Amino acid sequence: MNTPRVVVAGGGTAGHIEPALAVAESLRHRGAEVVALGTTKGLETSIVPERGFELRLINPVPVPRKINADLFKLPFRLLATISQTRKILKEFDTDVVIGFGGYVAAPAYIAAKLQKIPFIVHEANARSGMANKLGVRLGGMGLNAVANSGMPGTVVGIPIRSSLSGDNTALDRAQQLWGLDPEKKTILITGGSQGARSINAAVAEGIDAVLADPDVQVLHAYGRKNSAPEAQERYVPVAYIDDMAAAYAIADLVIGRSGAMTVAENTAAGIPAIYVPLPHGNGEQGLNAQPLVEEGAAVLVADSEFNGEAFSSLAAKILGDQETYNTMVIAAKESGTANAAETIADIIYSIVKNHDRNK
């Protein structure tokens, strides 16, 4: 079998990029050649090169939510982007395309279909998005993180970075990067790659009550476009966390949105969580977290109800009761699917092998 040449399409937010790169890393370890497809508008412009992968750019084609001039331009923009994507697939001599939803995925699926290149559609959320549903309808192989997403396909879980587990130096890095004490209980707060203003507001309101416990410290990723309270002893605000392995290594409790990638990484790390689902979209964030709540690994709080009092009281309840905490840790670890990236890499290699045989 020739060396597989794979294009991974996942851009915009970390929720689309991270699973794509987790699969890309697994493929690279096996000797495959991988190129990432993205746009100039997303986080991939920094994250992908930092991970050592080549990034090819196409024009983003967002779907307007209102009837306006942009809506009438949509077909022409989409055709132009599909043409760009087809050129990239041809130049790279692509064997397989795998998409993870978002603006980049739909042009990738359509271009792969037109080029007669096998393609895979991975849905990370509990409720599938439009681009991925389109991909499966076009003949792509559907892979789901969970059952009953609304998209046909095999359940494989969510691919996560191998560096998030088994990193013996991660705890030391957490101490060096943020001055955190590994002997204290650490709350990791994050609103995802974009931050979350409502969570930030609750932190500002409740941080003093949380820090009243001298055994608790807080690492707060508030988002590059947002602001946070001033740093103080045992409270470390940062705009963005580049080294999530270090953050997870020292964290005892995670508070944040319940995007599919966040939920997958938390459970793989075996960390109890308080999830505050994004109140917009099609409700997929609440659905992402619901199985963890039912299994006892997490608590779910509506965005409108998460304030300073909820922040401080829930954190104290979980971290202050060792039996409750231990039960949540066990439930989180049992819910994880840490081998999804390897499973998907196996599928890609099988497709390439069969495709070579049928040429």
Swiss-Prot record:
What EC numbers are recorded for this enzyme?
2.4.1.227
Residues engaged in binding UDP-N-acetyl-alpha-D-glucosamine: T13, A14, G15, N125, R161, S193, I241, Q285
Organism of origin: Corynebacterium diphtheriae (strain ATCC 700971 / NCTC 13129 / Biotype gravis)
Q: Which UniProt keywords apply?
A: Cell cycle, Cell division, Cell membrane, Cell shape, Cell wall biogenesis/degradation, Glycosyltransferase, Membrane, Peptidoglycan synthesis, Transferase
Which family is annotated? Belongs to the glycosyltransferase 28 family. MurG subfamily.
Pathway connected to this protein = Cell wall biogenesis; peptidoglycan biosynthesis
Known catalytic reactions: di-trans,octa-cis-undecaprenyl diphospho-N-acetyl-alpha-D-muramoyl-L-alanyl-D-glutamyl-meso-2,6-diaminopimeloyl-D-alanyl-D-alanine + UDP-N-acetyl-alpha-D-glucosamine = di-trans,octa-cis-undecaprenyl diphospho-[N-acetyl-alpha-D-glucosaminyl-(1->4)]-N-acetyl-alpha-D-muramoyl-L-alanyl-D-glutamyl-meso-2,6-diaminopimeloyl-D-alanyl-D-alanine + UDP + H(+)
Entries under InterPro entries matching the protein:
GlcNAc_MurG, Glyco_trans_28_C, GlycoTrans_28_N
**Where in the cell does this protein reside?**
Cell membrane
Q: What is the lineage of its organism?
A: Bacteria, Bacillati, Actinomycetota, Actinomycetes, Mycobacteriales
Q: Which PANTHER family match?
A: GLYCOSYLTRANSFERASE (PTHR21015:SF22), UDP-N-ACETYLGLUCOSAMINE--N-ACETYLMURAMYL-(PENTAPEPTIDE) PYROPHOSPHORYL-UNDECAPRENOL N-ACETYLGLUCOSAMINE TRANSFERASE 1 (PTHR21015)
Q: How does it sit in the membrane?
A: Peripheral membrane protein
**Gene3D superfamilies assigned to the protein according to its UniProt record, in alphabetical order:** Glycogen Phosphorylase B (3.40.50.2000)
Q: CDD domains under this entry?
A: GT28_MurG
Q: Which Pfam family, just one, is annotated for this protein?
A: Glyco_tran_28_C
Q: What is this protein called?
A: UDP-N-acetylglucosamine--N-acetylmuramyl-(pentapeptide) pyrophosphoryl-undecaprenol N-acetylglucosamine transferase
Q: MF terms per GO, please?
A: UDP-N-acetyl-D-glucosamine:N-acetylmuramoyl-L-alanyl-D-glutamyl-meso-2,6-diaminopimelyl-D-alanyl-D-alanine-diphosphoundecaprenol 4-beta-N-acetylglucosaminlytransferase activity; undecaprenyldiphospho-muramoylpentapeptide beta-N-acetylglucosaminyltransferase activity
* Single GO BP term: peptidoglycan biosynthetic process
Check the record and name the NCBIfam families matching this protein. Answer: murG
The job of this chain, per UniProt, is described as: Cell wall formation. Catalyzes the transfer of a GlcNAc subunit on undecaprenyl-pyrophosphoryl-MurNAc-pentapeptide (lipid intermediate I) to form undecaprenyl-pyrophosphoryl-MurNAc-(pentapeptide)GlcNAc (lipid intermediate II).
- Where does it sit, as one GO cellular component term? plasma membrane
